């Protein structure tokens, strides 16, 4: 169980496939669940018994096409201090999210044109130290500007002012993304004001 302990300490979760790569058979995982040492989180995914679930990892685990966006990305990037009450994910148009929605009922899905999906994807750490994919600050700002009428005004204002006051902002990418995503005029208005 030493290899497994180290893996779980680093990653938090393990899949059947990952366990097999480490030389741990599936029946051994089932045995550890039965003994109360592991907990089955979902089909083929296990964690140490008693560990706190990192819901962001659970949502994105084995879902390569899931990227956290909108409110969730703003929170992960430090542009919002409000913990989202539902997780906002973006997927390419045509991607089937039924398996995710079946497990989690607090998901808001945004379907993105395939040609725009990969723009601004980065990897960030969750509060638990696990890595997940989300859109960068510039893409997130473009996204919320495009959906500003559907957003909570305070979250929107905090994110916009937080971005323009941020030392890590990349104005070149902001303009580039805004042009591709069709919100350049709106972005330029905010740039003039802030």
Report residues per predicted region:
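Short amphipathic alpha-helical interface segments
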Residues: 1-13
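TRNA-binding/sensing appendages of the translation machinery
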Residues: 2, 16, 27
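Conserved short "hinge" loops at termini or chain/domain junctions
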Residues: 10, 15-17, 22, 42
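Nucleic-acid-binding surface
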Residues: 14-17, 33, 47-194
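Short amphipathic alpha-helical interaction segments
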Residues: 21-34
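A short, conserved structural fragment
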Residues: 36-43
């Amino acid at each position: 169980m030493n290899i497994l302990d180290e893996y779980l300490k680093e990653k938090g979760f393990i899949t059947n496939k990952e366990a097999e790569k480490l030389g741990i058979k599936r029946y051994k995982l089932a045995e550890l669940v039965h003994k109360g040492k592991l907990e089955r989180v979902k089909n083929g995914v296990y964690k140490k018994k008693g560990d706190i679930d990192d819901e962001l990892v659970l949502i994105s685990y084995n879902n390569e096409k899931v990227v956290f966006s909108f409110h969730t990305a703003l929170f992960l990037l430090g542009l919002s201090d409000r913990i989202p009450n539902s997780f906002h994910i973006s997927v390419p148009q045509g991607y089937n999210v039924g398996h995710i929605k079946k497990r989690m009922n607090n998901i808001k899905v945004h379907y993105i044109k395939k040609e725009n999906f990969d723009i601004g994807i980065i990897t960030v750490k969750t509060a638990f130290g696990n890595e997940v994919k989300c859109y960068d600050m510039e893409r997130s700002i473009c996204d919320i500007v495009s959906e500003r009428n559907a957003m909570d005004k305070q979250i929107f204002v905090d994110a916009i002012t937080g971005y323009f006051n941020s030392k890590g902002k990349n104005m070149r990418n902001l303009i580039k993304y805004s042009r591709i995503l069709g919100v350049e005029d709106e972005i330029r208005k905010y740039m003039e004001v802030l």
